[in-house]
Amino acid sequence: MPYHRKHRRLRDIVRVVQASGARTYSRGSGFFAFFFAVAALHAQTGPHVLTVASAVDGRQQSYALYIPRSFDPPKEYGLLISLHSEDSNHRMNLSQVLGIVGRGAMTLEGTSFPPLRGRDLIVACPLARGTMGYQGIAEQDVYDVLADVERRYPVDRDRVYLTGISMGVGGALWLAETRPDLWAGVAAMCPDSMPGSEDLAPNLLNVPLRLYHGELDTIVPVASSRAWQRRLLDAGVPVAYTEYPATRHNVWDVAYSRDGALEWLAAQRRNRWPDRVRLVARSYQYSSAYWVRIDSLTPGVPAQIDARRASNGDVQAITVNLDGFTLTAQEPQPSQVTVDGTAIRLKRGAPLSFNKSPAGWRQGLVAAAGKRIGAEGPILRALSGRQIYVYGTLGAQTDEELAERRKVAQAASNWSTVRSHLQLSFAVKADREVTAADLDSSDVVLFGTAKSNSLVARFAARLPIELRPDAADYGLLFIAPIGKHYALVNSGLPWWTGADETSASGYLWEPAQIRELNPFGDYVLFRGTIAQVVAEGRFDANWKLPADAAARLTAAGTVRIH
């Protein structure tokens, strides 16, 4: 039972007992134990460390939690999700939000933490695997924590906020950009941006936002916040920016404790139905906000829609790089939608969906394509959730050969790093050990070809390409949907062959597996080392190779196209 329901039930029982005049300290009556339970519930205000089972690997993931001393269910409370910086953790981050510095910052003893002065906020600080950015797996960890807190406590869904420090606020901006309709505001401390976040700035149009940075910051130079301010203002997004002349990287010490950042944040409320929505999306995964959903885009290419609702309900929309979208009905109902200058009188009772034909825009659903949410790529999508690494057993002549195949899969599955103190690894299985339940719940990373891996052979008809058996000194890596999940197939040389981590793209703190693959679309063919790319790119909307890409791949004589 959620905490607030238990609390309310016990409190109501106490009031009934007190009103009856009954003596409530008798061991025999059971009230002795009962009042200990009541006391324990009241004692749960203040700081704590909780865990939640990860949706990615099932392991318990820690997060720090602060319950205000005024906590009194069933009253609903605002929730602040705070994301820690690089080389930090959930405990330290809660200390920073509460204004604790020095020796007490790493403890979670209730006496070491002051209350959030004048702020009745619940604060949750996810560990999110430590230092690996806030995209993919760590991103899911944050949403797991959000769901867990909402399950346990009475949260006002119109008062859920984001803040963070450095890497953490880079993650906060990413979360706010990709799901802007969830958040009521963002307080951003010296942002270190996540890859791909800059282009999504228009999505923050309806999310109250303030930036804070120290002019003397040498870890994340002040140019970062200045660039974000310009970027947001150029996109028409209201933003306030405070720059502190004599402050280094620890801008939060001033902004949280003395400059009212959290007071301002706690006063904001989510706007569920803004009159104007701007949405930029490069994937179906993040293709909706508020009352607008993009139905047809080219993954990897930014699609844009700027939709404005008039007082009579009619809508005007300007689009770029998209062929279909849907609006959610609201009062007053629109009678006309104008798209890129074309006025469309609406059909009564028909869905508010629109598609682009050769003749122009019209009302109606866009034709479904093979690429869709959960089946769109790129390569990194197969490494962003629950995953199993699978080596082949077909044709192995010796135990030593089988051991070498297993060793390759194990190397890929181990994401742990000394540099960022990340400890993360995934299940490794032989092809014959993979069950139907595995395929129903997980993406699979398959090593080998149809001749060496039975799962590659099993799914061959669904795979768009394959490496020829005689393609010595080549490596091929590609993603394809199989059922509800992805298969990531690595044939020939392992994808990290010859990788130079110092030149890898992506976010500095991401695991090597992520950074090495960040530049690639749905497939990459390389020769000798991953630095020697022969061809790479995206499959089309139906998971087929475009003609020019097919010509490049077949020219090498190493790839067979299905």
Feature names for model-found ranges:
Residues 69-75, 131-166, 177-182:
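Gly/Ser-rich "nucleophile elbow"/oxyanion-hole loop immediately N-terminal to the catalytic nucleophile
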Residues 210-213, 217:
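Short beta-strand/loop motif that positions the catalytic acidic residue
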Residues 158-205:
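Primarily recognizes the serine-hydrolase "nucleophile elbow" in alpha/beta-hydrolase
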Residues 83-85, 190, 213, 317:
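The conserved beta1-alpha1 loop
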Residues 79, 83-151:
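Active-site machinery of serine-nucleophile hydrolases
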Residues 41-79:
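A domain-start/cap signature at the N-terminus of enzymes
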Residues 316, 328-330, 334-562:
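Solvent-exposed alpha-helical segments and adjacent loops
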Residues 218, 222-313, 321:
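C-terminal catalytic histidine-bearing segment of alpha/beta-hydrolase fold enzymes
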